[in-house]
């Protein structure tokens, strides 16, 4: 069972009574066939539910109104099988607050050259019915996605499935609660921001809880539960000698397990699916949560360090979007560089908190080592390298008048040397198009030092996310050239300035 099982997408057919009852009967038959086939063969993440034909303004308005109030409905897929005059859609689309995709398809793939007549033409009018629908969307300035292709085409299936992931993610985001244990790292700018504006724009709420409230729950965890979780650690990870039974750091592992159980209980009781910590607010905790955070991220929670609620929320959103896809998604930070002509590299990591979903090793190492920051006992953590291949790093920043999403396409590579003295998980990558261009563009656009790293999602996924939430996106990839990138930033200032 995944989050997608909690939602469905409504399949709505637009038509009109001009063509007579026989045509509408055939439209209904075609729709039933297409929906059944898509649910059976297209490997869509959500179930499609066919709704009654929309042939009048009142029918269409009722469908849109019902979609708004049905918590299971993640969005609408609309197919204009025949011509459907778009003025009939105005009232419904005006009130619709769920994502909308126009599937520009038709029942037949090939034209029946020898038998085609006007009855066939009247029945299969997607080619211009879809354009009428597109006009009213443009006229109303209503954002919606469009997928063109035959309903049996695998590429069309993939694009609809990708959009469904976005639609479900948007509904989940509207209910997302972000818990901040403590406040921001002191004096840091990019991790701060307008929480009210974020809730208005995205729907997620951000509130702070004292670390003492968490400590109270952590201290209530029984020794039996702690021992059971440590047994799980023993089976899932390669334990260093210091962390094994009778090892000198065994007690630190037990404390890490207690923190994990306490954090999870606190988050579950509060209905939180994203959270932050900061090493400056640890009063009452025996160690900075490292292992606990790593494992909670792997279970789907959003997280970011130093109170960075925007990145924590973005990680949760991207975790939902990527559910069931190959590859992992994690909190990340650009940490340090390797400068070598033609082979510039970025080493990404954090103090402790990198999600094991991106690990190359089947069984990461569980170790306890010293951490000077935070002033607490040595924390437990998982240590691993990262899978290789194409990936992205994404950052969501608050510019005051709007939100900007930055995405850099990267290529993760194998670490060329062992890192015997680096006691944290890490990722090594080549930034596209090259490190000087990527880093300069990122800095000019105001990108944060915290990011969400993902092998599972790609640039197109993040473009869809930005469009669905109506926010700015800046892209750094192999096509990026700094002069054009700077121009785009200037144009965006003008565009979004006019929209205020």
Swiss-Prot record:
Subunit structure: Homohexamer.
Tagged with keyword Isomerase: yes
Keyword presence, Metal-binding: yes
Protein name: L-arabinose isomerase
Family membership: Belongs to the arabinose isomerase family.
Function: Catalyzes the conversion of L-arabinose to L-ribulose.
Organism, scientific name: Escherichia coli O17:K52:H18 (strain UMN026 / ExPEC)
GO biological process: L-arabinose catabolic process to xylulose 5-phosphate
């Amino acid at each position: 069972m995944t989050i997608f099982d909690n939602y469905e997408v409504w399949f709505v057919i637009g038509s009109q009574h001009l063509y007579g009852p026989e045509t509408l009967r055939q439209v209904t038959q075609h729709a039933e066939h297409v929906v059944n086939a898509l649910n059976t063969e297209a490997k869509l993440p959500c179930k499609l539910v066919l709704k009654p034909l929309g042939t009048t303004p009142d029918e269409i308005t009722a469908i849109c109104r019902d979609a708004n109030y049905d918590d299971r409905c993640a969005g609408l897929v609309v197919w204009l099988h025949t011509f459907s005059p778009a003025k009939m859609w105005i009232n419904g689309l005006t009130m619709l607050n769920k994502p909308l995709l126009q599937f520009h398809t038709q029942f037949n793939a090939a034209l029946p050259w020898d038998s085609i007549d006007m009855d066939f033409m009247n029945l299969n009018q997607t080619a211009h019915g879809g354009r009428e629908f597109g006009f009213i969307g443009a006229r109303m300035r209503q954002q919606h996605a469009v997928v063109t292709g035959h309903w049996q085409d695998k590429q069309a299936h993939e694009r609809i499935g990708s959009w469904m992931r976005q639609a479900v993610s948007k509904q989940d985001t509207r209910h997302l609660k972000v818990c901040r244990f403590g406040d921001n790292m002191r004096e840091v700018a990019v991790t701060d921001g307008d929480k009210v504006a974020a809730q208005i724009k995205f729907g997620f709420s951000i509130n702070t809880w004292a670390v003492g409230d968490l400590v109270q729950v952590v201290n209530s965890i029984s020794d039996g539960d702690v021992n059971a979780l440590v047994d799980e650690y023993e089976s899932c990870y390669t334990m260093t000698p210091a962390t094994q039974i009778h090892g000198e750091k065994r007690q630190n592992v037990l404390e890490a397990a207690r923190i994990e159980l306490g954090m999870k209980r606190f988050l579950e009781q509060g209905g939180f699916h994203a959270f932050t910590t900061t090493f400056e607010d640890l009063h009452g905790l025996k160690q900075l949560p490292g292992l606990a955070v790593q494992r909670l991220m792997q279970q789907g929670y959003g997280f970011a360090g130093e109170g960075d609620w925007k990145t924590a929320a973005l990680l949760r959103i991207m975790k939902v979007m990527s559910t069931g896809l190959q590859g992992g998604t994690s909190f990340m930070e650009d940490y340090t560089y390797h400068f070598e002509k033609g082979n510039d590299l970025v080493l990404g990591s954090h103090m402790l908190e990198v999600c094991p979903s991106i690990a190359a090793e089947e069984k990461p190492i569980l170790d306890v080592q010293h951490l000077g920051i935070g002033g607490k006992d040595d924390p437990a953590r998982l240590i691993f390298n990262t899978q290789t291949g194409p990936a992205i790093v994404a950052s969501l920043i608050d510019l005051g008048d709007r939100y900007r999403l930055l995405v850099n396409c990267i290529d993760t590579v194998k670490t060329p040397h062992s890192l015997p003295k680096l006691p944290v998980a890490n990722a090594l990558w080549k930034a596209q198009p090259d490190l000087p261009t990527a880093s300069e563009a990122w800095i000019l656009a105001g990108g944060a030092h915290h990011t969400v790293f993902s092998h599972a999602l790609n640039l197109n996924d993040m473009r869809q996310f930005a469009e669905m939430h109506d926010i700015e996106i800046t892209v750094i990839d192999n096509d990026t050239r700094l002069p054009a990138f700077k121009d785009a930033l200037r144009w965006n200032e003008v565009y979004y300035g006019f929209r205020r």
